Each structure stands twice: as C-alpha cells, then as structure tokens.
C-alpha cells in the first residue's frame, strides 16, 4: 500500500496557482501520502511544473487526460488509480493552510469507523490574497443531516473520505457540471456518518473565474433538481426548495440586471451623501 492518504488534485490551465496547492500538500505533517495530479488536457506549462516537483518527491504522479474531461470525470479517474485507504481533495487554486490537516482527519476516521467523511472550515480570499470571509460548517452527523438539503455542508477541498465509500456510492456523477460534490455527500449520508472538524484548514480562492460562478443560473437550476432527488432521504425539503428557488430567481438575467442597477444606485447615493 503506497500512501494511506491519496490526495487527488485536478488542474486545468492554472499554473500560477498550482505550485502553492502542491506545496501545501507536500508540507503536511502527515507524510504517508501520494499526490495524484490530474492534468485535464492543459496546453500550458502545467506538465513542466508537475515534473519539477516529481523530480524531488517520488510521491507525486501526473495523470494526463488527452482531452478535457471536466471535473467529475477527472476526479473519478484519479480516485480509480489511488492506492490509499483515504481520499483527500485539493483544487489547483486552493491550498491547505493547516499543516496538520491530514493528521487530524486521519486520526478522526481511524478512531470513528462508523464515519466515512470528515470535512473542516474554510477561509475565502480574493485574487490579491485578502481575506473575504471564514466560516465553519455544521459539526455533527445530526446537524449535517438537518441542513444538507438547504446548502452544501462541506467545503470540497477540506474533505477526507474513505475510498471504499466512494466506490460503494458510485463515485462522482459524471453527468453533473456543477455540485458534483454536494450530490456525492448526499449519497454518502445514505451509507455512513458525516462530520466536520471545527477548525479552519483550507484557503479557497474566490474569483470571477471559479467554475461554480461561471454559470450561476445553470448551477441554481441543478441545485433545485438535487434537492428534489434526495427529498425523501433528508428533512426540510420545502425549506431547501424555497432557498433554491430564490437563488434561481435571483440568477435570471433580468433580475440580475435589476439587482446590479439597484446596487449601483445605492453606491452613488452613499457617495453623494458624504
């Protein structure tokens, strides 16, 4: 067994961020790892950057897609080749800000065999590195189940989960362009327990180029369908549906335009009163 923890890091044309993500994985106190970097058909210097690190650290493997497969397919491909008992997620524009992140999560899963997934808190920064917000997610399995239809209760790049749970749940749904993680967590909840450490372990870059911000309307529509799909498995469906419906309405072009105009007018009003 090479690496009790397999870190799966998909990347596509983000060489400027990739180095920091790689280094945050390699600098973990927990050393029994393998780092699988799935290069999703990048045509830039991504492969060269990976090769530089792989020269000095044999725990790194590049998995190169000949054509772009997208996030869900890339994740499944990486996990299929993973040799570890546990899978950790990391994105190319995020980094782990706690060197003991894996150590803490492995210890939790090793001592709580009934749990299959453990996440943690997240810090969001802008492209200049300024902190925008930090937050913790619901902690216990009971708390998570109460809110899982309201919003995604895990930061994707904070999680550690059992590989056999991923296999038993059927992996990431490759038909989803958004929220593939949220969908998987809801399937995980049907076969085991879920938990969030109350600590900040990952720093997430929030930019206008993030996948989940690229098509807000499509994402909102998909999230409504996810809530319908799992309404019999978790409580508070109607509350979650109304939250999702509100998000969908706000994503409509005319509403988005009116909201932008309103915010712009409020800004002018505040300036004029100074």
Feature map (PLM): residue ranges:
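Nucleotide-sugar donor-binding/catalytic module of glycosyltransferases
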Residues: 1-216, 270-273
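Short secondary-structure transition/capping segments
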Residues: 165-174, 205-208, 225-227, 242-254
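Catalytic core of nucleotide-sugar-dependent glycosyltransferases
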Residues: 200-207, 213-238
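Membrane-proximal basic amphipathic "stem/tether" segments
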Residues: 232-274
């Amino acid at each position: 067994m090479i690496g009790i923890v397999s870190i799966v890091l998909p990347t596509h044309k983000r060489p400027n961020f990739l180095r920091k993500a790689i280094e945050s994985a390699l600098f973990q106190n927990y050393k029994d790892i393998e780092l699988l970097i799935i290069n999703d058909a990048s045509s830039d210097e991504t492969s060269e950057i990976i090769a530089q690190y792989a020269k000095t650290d044999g725990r790194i493997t590049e998995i190169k897609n000949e054509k772009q497969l997208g996030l869900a397919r890339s994740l499944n491909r990486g996990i299929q080749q993973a040799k570890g008992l546990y899978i950790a997620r990391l994105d190319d524009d995020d980094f782990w800000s706690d060197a003991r992140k894996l150590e803490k999560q492995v210890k939790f899963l090793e001592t709580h065999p009934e749990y299959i997934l453990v996440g943690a808190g997240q810090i969001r920064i802008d492209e200049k590195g300024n902190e925008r917000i930090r937050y913790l997610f619901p902690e216990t399995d009971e708390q998570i189940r109460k809110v899982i239809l309201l919003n995604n209760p895990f930061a994707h790049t904070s999680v550690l989960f059992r590989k056999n749970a991923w296999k038993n749940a059927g992996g990431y749904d490759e038909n989803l362009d958004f929220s593939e993680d949220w969908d998987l967590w809801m399937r995980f909840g049907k076969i085991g327990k879920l938990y969030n450490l109350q600590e900040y372990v990952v720093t997430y870059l929030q930019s206008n180029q993030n996948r989940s911000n690229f098509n807000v309307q499509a994402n909102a529509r998909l999230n409504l369908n996810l809530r319908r799909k799992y309404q019999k498995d978790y409580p508070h469906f109607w509350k979650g549906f109304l939250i999702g419906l509100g998000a969908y309405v706000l994503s409509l072009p005319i509403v988005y335009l009116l909201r932008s105009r309103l915010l712009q007018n409020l800004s002018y009003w505040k300036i004029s009163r100074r």
